[in-house]
């Protein structure tokens, strides 16, 4: 709420400390914590879960992936980048679940799907760590103006061809992800569900 946008190393420190506080609260009783980033005085959860909820850590870069392996109960990622899951395993993630979000844009017309993906999800075409470093929405809007349709469709399967969607999903399965969810970019959710139920999911099982 108005704080500065810290550099990535500080954000990861904050995440690790926040997870520590969350788990202490889930263990029950009064919790006090005096850390580098957070202070908690005599906090308590009165309605406790029957067991600790799993903490899935989202990560894309090497430092975040190593943190996810060390403190997380699982990994969430957006890219089948080479070596990512190996680093996760080496940091303590071996045997933990790996979730991938796969961006897709189904529409009956491929050109329409490409335009929709570019209009609604230009972040998919931003290179490197740019999207993680922009602190305010206006910066996202400015960066989005530099993204081309071709940049977005490099990572987003678009249109009605099931082969393109299957090929896109298999990149994540082949990389070692064991859970995938598909994010439909665009308004036709019913059409997307029907297409995946009939044409895509049976060929991925």
Label each residue range with its predicted role.
Residues 1-205:
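Active-site-adjacent structural elements that line small-molecule/cofactor binding pockets in enzymes
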């Amino acid at each position: 709420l108005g704080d500065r946008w810290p550099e990535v190393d500080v954000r990861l420190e904050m995440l690790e400390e926040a997870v520590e506080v969350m788990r202490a609260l889930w263990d029950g009783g009064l919790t006090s914590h005096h850390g580098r980033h957070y202070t908690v005085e005599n906090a308590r959860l009165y309605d406790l879960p029957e067991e600790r909820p799993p903490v899935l850590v989202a990560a894309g870069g090497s430092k975040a992936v190593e943190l996810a392996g060390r403190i997380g109960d699982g990994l969430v990622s957006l890219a089948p980048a080479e070596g990512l899951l190996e680093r996760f395993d080496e940091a303590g993630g071996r045997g933990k679940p790996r979730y991938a979000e796969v961006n897709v844009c189904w529409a009956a017309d491929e050109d329409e799907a490409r335009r929709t993906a570019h209009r609604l999800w230009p972040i998919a075409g931003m290179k490197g760590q740019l999207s993680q470093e922009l602190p305010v929405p206006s910066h996202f809007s400015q960066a989005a103006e530099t993204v081309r349709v071709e940049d977005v469709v490099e990572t987003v399967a678009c249109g009605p061809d099931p082969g393109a969607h299957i090929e896109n999903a298999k990149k994540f399965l082949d990389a070692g992800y064991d859970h995938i969810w598909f994010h439909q970019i665009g308004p036709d959710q019913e059409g997307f569900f029907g297409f995946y139920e009939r044409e895509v999911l049976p060929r991925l099982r």
